[in-house]
Amino acid sequence: EPLFRTVGNDATFYRPPTASQLSRYLNQIPEDFEMCAKVWEEITIPTYATHARYGIKAGQRNPNFLNADAFIKLVLQPYRDARFGPHTGPFLFEFQRHGLSVQEFCSGLDGFFARLPKDFRYAVEIRNAGMLGPQYHEVLRRHDVAHVYNHWTFMPSLAEQHQRMRTFTAPFSVFRLQTPLRMTHEAAKTRAEPYNRIVGELPEMRQDTVRLVRQAASENRTTYVLVNNRAEGNAPLTIQALVESLRE
């Protein structure tokens, strides 16, 4: 049985794919393969950072933040045009740390997901642990949107995230194993390069992932586990270890 049944597409965070790009993917992927694409950041950042890539928009408020019409037209439509549906995994909305209150953020999510088509699946990844809680959980549950369990620098462990969430919120679950906890992106990158071996196992990450995947499976939830080389040094070897643990 193949280990690689899905992939996370990070490039779509910077620009949504065109229908022609998606059509080219169709010619390269197996029949039962699904792609989990990050949503264009134009939809997920309330204010543009003071970064050169934003040009004259740097530091300004983003009028397309949680704009359902923009998402449907600019992000979803190419998938429809390319007839990519059977290969479309959950769309991943990555929200960087921001200045919104829990109430503001959850209210925005609620109105946004209420307007989205129900024939696609959506998942939210937050980078601010303070957002985890009943209000966030309820909004996701109401719209069958998954929380992305992200093993990332400033987030709590996967087990603690689930403890705060209490239950899964959608008929599917998503895990992104990205960096060791409390380690910056650059430090994790330096540690992991050249990505050809396990440079340091993360036992808690592995154990939490296996336990939560088993729980999701016992509840008949489809599960997507996306692993970055920066987590342990070599994503395929991490995936192989997780699969072996799941088979025990």
How would you name each of these model-derived features?
Residues 1-248:
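Residues lining hydrophobic/aromatic ligand-binding pockets adjacent to catalytic sites
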